[in-house]
Amino acid sequence: MKRVFSLMTGWSTRKPWLVLGIIALLTAVAVAGALRIQMEFSQEALLPDKYPSIATLRKVEEDFGGLNYAKVLLTGSDLLSPEAALVLFQYQEALQGGAGSAEWEDLVLRVESYLSFLLRNPQARALMSLYSSLRTSGSGEEAMAAVREFLVSEEARSMEGEPEAAPFLQGLRIAAEQGEAGAGKAEYLVEAAVSEALHRYLESVGAMVLGRTVTADGKAAVVNIQVRPDLPQAEVLRRAGKLEDFTVDFFASRGLAAEVSGEVYMMKALQHLSLRDSAVLGIIALFFIALVLFLTFRKVLDIFLTLAVVFVSLLWIFGIMGFAGIRYTVMGMALIPLMLGIDIAYSIHVLTRYYEERDKRKGAEDSAVSSVVTVGIAVFLAAATTIFGFLSFSISDLPPIRQFGFLCLGGVLFGFLLSITMLPAALVIRDRRRGVRETRRVEEHLLLDWLDRGLARLSLLAERHRLPVWIGCLVLVVACGLSVLGISTSADFRTFVPQDLPSYRSFTRIEEYFGGQDTTVALLEGEDLLSPPSLRKMDEFVSAVLDHPRNLTPEGERKYFRPEKTNSLPGIFRALKALSSAEAAGANPAGEAVQEAEPGDWVPVSREEAEVLLSRAEEAFGFESTSLLTPDGKSSLVAFEVPFVNEEGEKEMAFILRDAASAVSATGTFDIRLTGMPLIISDALDKLFTTQLESGGLALLLCALLVMVVFRSMAYGLTATSVVFLAILLEVGLLRLIGWPLDIMTVMIASLVIGAGIDFGIHVAHRFREELYENRLGPEEAVNATVRNVGTALISAAVTTSGAFLILAISSFSPLRRFGVITALALASACFAALVLEPTFLTTVATRLDRRVRAGGKGSED
């Protein structure tokens, strides 16, 4: 291995300009790839398509347009007035169906408001259109032209047979005969007709809109805009930004206040914050590491060279992201501080040893080669074990974690290769004309020299009092190990969004006005879903969900799923039955009438009758059957609007749905597949803890085996690995102590700490063996020499790495803050254990091996 390093570094130092030229060319290509990076912030991107909740979501998107909605909250003095209804009508027309709506057709699939049912009636739509024309006409002549056009329309002729419409139509004809002078009268008549239509509409279907899309007092209303599922998220967010500007300006100019929210706007806010945080965190990490490097080497050019290694490796990572189509996510925000912290350590170790060799009055080329050959094995082991740590992410089922591990793996590999090629080449170009006059700057640093001596004393103190140190360590291990039982999990991407953001506050306000706004659906698939048995089973499923014991409070109230927030075919047929009963009795069908229908008397007697009743429902309620039933009748949706709750609530909702679906599906009438945020989050939560165990265990095993093979000693391999084992347990203990959950970010800490933290243990073990077996020092002297020679480099690497992660604590995202703080503390503890605890293990191992050799037994050394 030393020969390989010698050849690579030797060639780099002999042809430094060629090496730098090749690296510059590769970097230019990487920049081209980096420009192709796209961003992705969505909950479903967390899981692979093979998961049931995601596979079902894709089917719902294909058949029904998906579950992604932008929401507009409107507030005003009276949103049920004709004037406010007109503004809402004009807005819906602007987005879908009217002049200028083509601008939004690639984004908007469907627009729903409290007016939607009314506007599906041709006569009502024609009346609203006439009202809009009269209010926006530029002259009396233009207004009367609109009136005359309406009077000869098919909709006006269909109103002729309605006695209550006769006075209205007669008044319009008189106004039309008066010409421009009749414009005012026409507008008055139309406004009165719209007011009457709204009143009758709310009386007939009030239970379907009041409290759901408009408050009973008319002070607030919500517009649900279904977003097309086939657009890339980057395009969705771009167009959503334009829609937000248009919406706010549209309503503000008409005297209404509008706020936008929904998942699309939360993800948009997440993207904006992530870009801002990436820049801020990267700059702060850069200045912090530059300061640490300056205190270590006290040379501006040294700072530039070590940072150049990291910057080039980062550019190569982003180039791979662009060419491989890997999207930038919230997890990507940790890439820059992470690589700054890890890759800089390799350069620090090489540069520190370079000055050590220069202090021996060697030339630049010889010093560069010697520095890599001597410290190269330790740096290689550090890089290889870190790579194994990130390689363990490949077994995760969660795509973002796999991709993050792949990128970090590449970054570590690039950082190592550049440290033994680019850095030596640059050092030779800088120093070869200086001969052998260079001195080792680290030795001249009094503070660092004091630190070296202090660390050596602390290590020797621990070595001389092994038993108390080991007992204390054992107590800590047991305490932290037991704490794993109390760790919670979190997988909701919406918790990434700071609660003071406008989109989050607006979403909360919408829920305060109208209840739950998250849509969770059951996709029912069967041969004949309109048959009476299927409809009864469908209703049985809805009842099983609504009346599930875990959906009920001790007082009998429903916690998550409510009948008034449930949309299904049985619900439509029940409402239609109530309407028919009310009409027969000569009364208005209030919302309570739906509940008064006898069980089962709402069920159509045949599929043919069901189809007829659905057509009638479309006329009576403005109900759009394709929103709940596919044209072939083989797939239907049951949609529940549920509140935004914590992960425990999401898990409970998922359990209720699965339990009810399991009971009904067992009959074989149809299959029930479930999706929506509770199901997606539940699937993700199930994987977080197993991901931690599987990836962490694999990383620890691979790293331990590699160190054992390279050291050719199980004892030394386990000793070097012990520091990360302790750091992982400390991580678990800290999570439990602080009360932080295991989430999409913190789940990666174990493997990361294993991969990056084992570097400290490797460098100490490698240098100890060098002092013990090559320099022939005794165990205590070897500990002293080891800590004094590598202590500064390890502390510098630990400060830069831990500091880079600690900088994440100022992020806007709480999961990223938790990730940064816990990782920083775990890595710092790994460094401390390597310098203080590991020497006690090393001297014990060395003493026992020496006794075996003296006794004539076979040692395990080289």
Where are these regions (language model features)?
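Pore- and gate-forming transmembrane helices of large, multi-pass membrane proteins
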Residues: 278-280, 307, 346, 359-396, ...
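Hydrophobic, glycine/alanine-rich multi-pass transmembrane helices and their short helix-loop junctions
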Residues: 292, 321, 380-423, 704-708, ...
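Transmembrane helices with small-residue packing motifs
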Residues: 19-54, 64, 74, 395, ...
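Extracytoplasmic
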Residues: 55, 103-300, 311, 553-704, ...
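Hydrophobic alpha-helical segments
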Residues: 317-436, 809-811, 826
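Interfacial helix-loop-helix hairpins and adjacent transmembrane helices
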Residues: 1-24, 369, 417-477, 773, ...
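Interfacial segments of transmembrane alpha-helices in multi-pass membrane proteins
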Residues: 271-328, 395-399, 694-740, 810-814
